[in-house]
C-alpha cells in the first residue's frame, strides 16, 4: 500500500517540478528581454564615458541573450521530458492504443481464417470430384475385365451388334474327342472258323 501511495506522490512531485521549470524559464526569457530593451535606451552622459558605457551595455546584452537562449533550450528539454512522462505514465492512452492494435490484428486474423476456410472448401470439392472420376473410371475398367470377351467388347463398343457376338460361339463346332467313337460299330461275323451258309437245292 505504501508503494502504491508513493507512486502517485512521485508523479505529483514530478509534475510540480515541471510546472516550476516552465514558470522559471518563461520568467527568465521575459526579464532578460526586458533588460535588453532597457539597455538599448540611450541615457544622458554620466561620470562613465560613452565608450565604456557602450562596451558595458554590449556585454550585458550578450549575457542576457545567452540567458534567453538557455531558457529556450530548457523549455525544449521540458517538452521532451513531458512527452516521455506521458508515454511512460499515461496508461489509459497506452492501453487504448494496445486495444486498437489488438482489434486490427483480430480483424486481420478473422479475414485470413475466412479466406483459408473458403480455399479449403474449394480444394475439398475439387478433390472429391477427382476421386469420384478416378474410382468411376477404375470400376468401369474392372467390370469390363470380369465380363466375357464378347460382352466386354460389346459394352465398350455400342455400335457392335449383339447378335454377332451371340452367333460367334455357334459357328465353331466342338471337335470330337480322340478316344470316344461318334457312332456304334456294326458287329462283324468271322468266317474263318465256321462253315459258310447252308445252300439249299
From Swiss-Prot:
Its main location: nucleus. Keywords: Activator, Coiled coil, Nucleus, Transcription, Transcription regulation. It comes from the Eukaryota. It is found in: Nucleus. GO terms for molecular function: transcription coregulator activity. Residues 93-123 form a coiled coil. Residues 166-201 are annotated as: Disordered. One of its GO terms (cellular component) is mediator complex. The keyword Nucleus applies. The keyword Membrane does not apply. Component of the Mediator complex, which is composed of MED1, MED4, MED6, MED7, MED8, MED9, MED10, MED11, MED12, MED13, MED13L, MED14, MED15, MED16, MED17, MED18, MED19, MED20, MED21, MED22, MED23, MED24, MED25, MED26, MED27, MED29, MED30, MED31, CCNC, CDK8 and CDC2L6/CDK11. The MED12, MED13, CCNC and CDK8 subunits form a distinct module termed the CDK8 module. Mediator containing the CDK8 module is less active than Mediator lacking this module in supporting transcriptional activation. Component of the Mediator complex, a coactivator involved in the regulated transcription of nearly all RNA polymerase II-dependent genes. Mediator functions as a bridge to convey information from gene-specific regulatory proteins to the basal RNA polymerase II transcription machinery. Mediator is recruited to promoters by direct interactions with regulatory proteins and serves as a scaffold for the assembly of a functional preinitiation complex with RNA polymerase II and the general transcription factors. This is Mediator of RNA polymerase II transcription subunit 22. It comes from Bos taurus. The gene is MED22.
Amino acid at each position: 500500500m505504501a508503494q502504491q501511495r508513493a507512486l502517485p506522490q512521485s508523479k505529483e512531485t514530478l509534475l510540480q517540478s515541471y510546472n516550476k521549470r516552465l514558470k522559471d524559464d518563461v520568467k527568465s526569457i521575459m526579464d532578460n528581454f526586458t533588460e535588453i530593451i532597457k539597455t538599448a535606451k540611450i541615457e544622458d552622459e554620466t561620470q562613465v564615458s560613452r565608450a565604456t558605457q557602450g562596451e558595458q551595455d554590449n556585454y550585458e546584452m550578450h549575457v542576457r541573450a545567452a540567458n534567453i537562449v538557455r531558457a529556450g533550450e530548457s523549455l525544449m528539454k521540458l517538452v521532451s521530458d513531458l512527452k516521455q512522462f506521458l508515454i511512460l505514465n499515461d496508461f489509459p492512452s497506452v492501453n487504448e492504443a494496445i486495444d486498437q492494435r489488438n482489434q486490427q490484428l483480430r480483424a486481420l486474423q478473422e479475414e485470413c481464417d475466412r479466406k483459408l476456410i473458403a480455399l479449403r472448401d474449394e480444394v475439398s470439392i475439387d478433390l472429391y470430384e477427382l476421386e469420384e472420376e478416378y474410382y468411376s473410371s477404375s470400376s468401369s475398367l474392372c467390370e469390363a475385365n470380369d465380363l466375357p470377351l464378347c460382352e466386354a467388347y460389346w459394352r465398350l463398343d455400342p455400335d457392335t451388334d449383339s447378335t454377332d457376338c451371340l452367333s460367334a460361339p455357334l459357328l465353331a463346332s466342338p471337335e470330337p474327342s480322340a478316344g470316344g467313337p461318334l457312332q456304334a460299330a456294326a458287329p462283324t461275323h468271322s468266317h474263318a472258323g465256321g462253315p459258310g451258309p447252308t445252300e439249299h437245292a
